[in-house]
Amino acid sequence: MTKLMVRSECMLRMVRRRPLRVQFCARWFSTKKNTAEAPRINPVGIQYLGESLQRQVFGSCGGKDEVEQSDKLMELSKKSLKDHGLWGKKTLITDPISFPLPPLQGRSLDEHFQKIGRFNSEPYKSFCEDKFTEMVARPAEWLRKPGWVKYVPGMAPVEVAYPDEELVVFDVETLYNVSDYPTLATALSSTAWYLWCSPFICGGDDPAALIPLNTLNKEQVIIGHNVAYDRARVLEEYNFRDSKAFFLDTQSLHIASFGLCSRQRPMFMKNNKKKEAEVESEVHPEISIEDYDDPWLNVSALNSLKDVAKFHCKIDLDKTDRDFFASTDKSTIIENFQKLVNYCATDVTATSQVFDEIFPVFLKKCPHPVSFAGLKSLSKCILPTKLNDWNDYLNSSESLYQQSKVQIESKIVQIIKDIVLLKDKPDFYLKDPWLSQLDWTTKPLRLTKKGVPAKCQKLPGFPEWYRQLFPSKDTVEPKITIKSRIIPILFKLSWENSPVIWSKESGWCFNVPHEQVETYKAKNYVLADSVSQEEEEIRTHNLGLQCTGVLFKVPHPNGPTFNCTNLLTKSYNHFFEKGVLKSESELAHQALQINSSGSYWMSARERIQSQFVVPSCKFPNEFQSLSAKSSLNNEKTNDLAIIIPKIVPMGTITRRAVENAWLTASNAKANRIGSELKTQVKAPPGYCFVGADVDSEELWIASLVGDSIFNVHGGTAIGWMCLEGTKNEGTDLHTKTAQILGCSRNEAKIFNYGRIYGAGAKFASQLLKRFNPSLTDEETKKIANKLYENTKGKTKRSKLFKKFWYGGSESILFNKLESIAEQETPKTPVLGCGITYSLMKKNLRANSFLPSRINWAIQSSGVDYLHLLCCSMEYIIKKYNLEARLCISIHDEIRFLVSEKDKYRAAMALQISNIWTRAMFCQQMGINELPQNCAFFSQVDIDSVIRKEVNMDCITPSNKTAIPHGEALDINQLLDKSNSKLGKPNLDIDSKVSQYAYNYREPVFEEYNKSYTPEFLKYFLAMQVQSDKRDVNRLEDEYLRECTSKEYARDGNTAEYSLLDYIKDVEKGKRTKVRIMGSNFLDGTKNAKADQRIRLPVNMPDYPTLHKIANDSAIPEKQLLENRRKKENRIDDENKKKLTRKKNTTPMERKYKRVYGGRKAFEAFYECANKPLDYTLETEKQFFNIPIDGVIDDVLNDKSNYKKKPSQARTASSSPIRKTAKAVHSKKLPARKSSTTNRNLVELERDITISREY
């Protein structure tokens, strides 16, 4: 393939030539590449899809020539790229890729995805919408019989094979200390109750039994709370053939609609404890405004069924009977059978009621059918494995781990034995900075009267620290582990080349000479407390030494308020690598290496060993193949097993999936025991895994949000770096960040993703400190600020607008993200999914959680990407009869289990799904173009196991045999495969899809656009790309002048209008303050009329701007206005009089004056909206809190009209005592007549009454 490296100037000339149009004659779904097309390149050098693919993907919406782009927009983009050293940099241009795609199901991508989303959602969505709300009566007594028993009210119980309704609510209970297999289960349908009992509690001895639900043959919805746990106990789910059941999780629905972010959870739990304490003490405080500082506390709940049922349905679940299932004796279940079945049935009832409340809310939050269809796909993951290999993996990893523990402990014991030999050499150990910290006092040998050693003596003659390592007199070897407190002393660890010292009050510390104290303070180290300092002085004094330094605390990963109590955890590994933490002992080095190798298994072993592995040998009738025509039940498959991962499909507020083992599994590392976990997922004979990693998924989404402002890919600096940046040229985002910070490229990735997820400069400073502890606070702050000034930009606090970013490579992006986060109802740009109620702006006051809301906008869009991809794949699999099903998705990775004969077709389906998904993102953000270099996966992996790269050997301490490599194909290699064509489609699928109606859905950004004027869009964009604040101020003035001049021109007035004219009109009341988020700028003028849907000329993107209405504090103060007028000599006589007029109110009127309008009144009104009456009355009481008794007292005591004394020259002294004395001895004014007093009192009472009515 020809590769041309061209500069942007050449590209501008190329785009003005119309690309060669080629008549497409290839047979449908042929994979022959069409190389006759010319590259299509945009004005900033980004290559777009070839004309053939462009026409197939975007239809009539796409294909606009780049010469039609606004010259002004391109000038601004060019300026931004130049300022960041990207304009003119080389870009990669390749031959256009061209091959036929399956036709879209509609005229646009949105119509296409709506229809296939409905196709994949039905009939399940209809089942949910038609779900019963009235529950049938529960039976008075349950029968303990193996299998299913159906209970219909008014009829005798009957044994059935499985529930036969289309929707059931389901719950399973297990004797989890005996077996992972189910013990009993209950289900509820619209007509009956069902109970399933394991043969184990009905006279059998083997607990290995699964629950039949006929999920292979019947389309049905099975509802449960954390239903993945229940699904793992369903018999038919242990098949390679795809299930027809939708296991719908109410926990996921709750989290997506009402969940809490990680920053909210601690506050929420603290508030819950406070409420529980008030209930227990029977304290019921009055409602106050302070109780509503965080309204989100009242619109969310934790995720357990007990908390969710309490929050949504006011149901108090008693979970005490759950403890019976912790028994190791099945007779406990048998003896309490009726009680425990009713306990399970109560959970079913609560789950049903919770679903009735949550499901309609979820559909409003996530209205696009793809969101529901994607949830169905992620709810049926399976992980095939081989039973013997799985057991070998567990045994090998555990054995090596235990061996490593023994090795570590043996080396520690050897160190101890070497040290204890020094017990008779005090001159040596007392001078050693580590050994001198040990207690060397000895207990002498006790002798009887006969001179024989007394019995039951514990190591007489040995030092106390050594004796404490022997718990009893029978202990032969010291009992010690790597976590023992004494280990850092024995290993002779040092921090910053200073021996570590233990303090009860401050944890591990280190000594710093007095002359270097300020240096270490500047490095952000924290002094140990005074008690620790005093203890160290006493210790050194007792040793006959002089204390020559000050103790500083070894930093803790969680911050300076925590004490470091263990220096050998994973958090301190990088300090060893950087030489900050060292050891003087060679044996200690070996022990640390052994400890490091076992760290992964030590942390993950319980989660891995608890996996529920179901082998085919126990259920020979299951494990059916993907094809209904063939079977896997033969001698080669007796070793097969399946793990159903306990995935919560929407386990976070960003709707990401959560699972504690597989979704957090690390990649295989040569020095980590058990790190080859993912390779234990193995395809059965005749099958393979086909999958891909989405390249920089969330970074691309974020950059696309910024590029959409210019309506061109690569228009912003971050967009250009994301698409064309390279390590060799130093133009990719991570390399540029690494250059600024002076760190590695991998470390720079952490800073970049943290910043895009909403983290601030403080986060960067703390992270820098962790990577390089030798940096001072001032240095880290300076470097972090430099990074954020280059990326996020500088801040502008306008007199008319709120704060915004300008001048950085990511300023436009962050202004846009903050704009989304600041909306009343933030939505993801593509599928329009709404944010959880706990993060909606109306529920946030004291805490804004802005970083969490920005993070939500990006990560939730990443979930939209996954749902679109899954939905598209399911459609293509059905349409072209591919033998494939989803295996697992790990954030930006996706893997399908595919028959060997269909592996290349499945790979092509993935590439097609990706181009549709990327194009959908672009179109919904207003760009009907797609860059060629991100349209396809960089490679599709075809492998026998799951691993990060197909060419990884996955050699670890627990796996000495290299795994055969797989196959990785890019789009061109895939097109060269003759068997990669999708083949003949199933026409019935398209006929079903076409039956679904399309409802036009206004793109989210277009919906936001209606709030902004074209003038603002034009000027605000120009302000963001400026690097000089003076240019930003100039553009602000021009913006006001242009907007108002247009208004004057419409009225026939040709006078020019400036910013100062605007300010005067605001003061005179002729104009209201400019409202940036208003329908248009001219709303401030009386009788002004303008079209809300007016668009910018020449394809200017109609886009929401980034900030809300400026509040009163953002408008210049009166004195500032006056100064500006004086400077311009534009103060007229009317304003002079206004500024110098005298106040006509009396002192008492001024004393009790209350303003009941303006911003404060509006805020009070807004706070009272949708609030309880008690809260409204309390707010009103505080708002109108005029001390009436004080007013009456002042009137009756003739304080209503005393005159102000003329000002006198101040004395030299300003003593507060003298001032107080003057106030005490001031003369009273003469008394007024009683008639005046009564009249004033009546008028004041009338005014107060009127004010309250207002």
Curated annotation (Swiss-Prot):
EC number(s) reported in the record: 2.7.7.7
SMART domains to which the protein is assigned, alphabetical: POLAc (SM00482)
Name of the protein described by the UniProt record: DNA polymerase gamma
Organism (species): Saccharomyces cerevisiae (strain ATCC 204508 / S288c) (Baker's yeast)
GO biological process: cellular response to nitrogen starvation; mitochondrial DNA catabolic process; mitochondrial DNA replication; mitochondrial genome maintenance
GO cellular component, one term: mitochondrion
The protein's enzyme class: transferase
Role of this protein: Involved in the replication of mitochondrial DNA.
Residue ranges, annotated region (Disordered): 1125-1145, 1202-1240
